[in-house]
Swiss-Prot record:
InterPro entries: UPF0346 (IPR010673), YozE_SAM-like (IPR023089), YozE_SAM-like_sf (IPR036806). It comes from the Bacteria. This is UPF0346 protein Bsph_2735. Pfam families: YozE_SAM_like. Gene3D superfamilies: YozE SAM-like. Belongs to the UPF0346 family.
């Protein structure tokens, strides 16, 4: 079975406690129309985040979410 995209994984954090950087990242990512939604590639995703970082779409939150994403069974 193919692993779901990082985008679909992060969407599971939407609607949570706004004090959580993962939640803020998920909400911001959802509204980014050019986000690489099908990607499972770290370099493609991190390059996008580095290029389009915002107050909520941070590389720190991305790194934490990527660790969680990679840790999935």
């Amino acid at each position: 079975m193919m692993k779901k995209s990082f985008y679909l994984y992060v969407l599971t954090f939407r609607g949570g406690d706004w004090s959580d950087p993962k939640v803020r990242f998920a909400e911001e990512m959802f509204h980014e129309h050019n986000f690489p939604k099908q990607s499972t590639d770290f370099n493609e995703l991190s390059n996008y985040i580095e290029s389009y970082a915002t107050e909520n779409l941070t590389i720190e939150a991305f790194d934490h979410l990527w660790e969680l994403y990679e840790g999935q069974a």
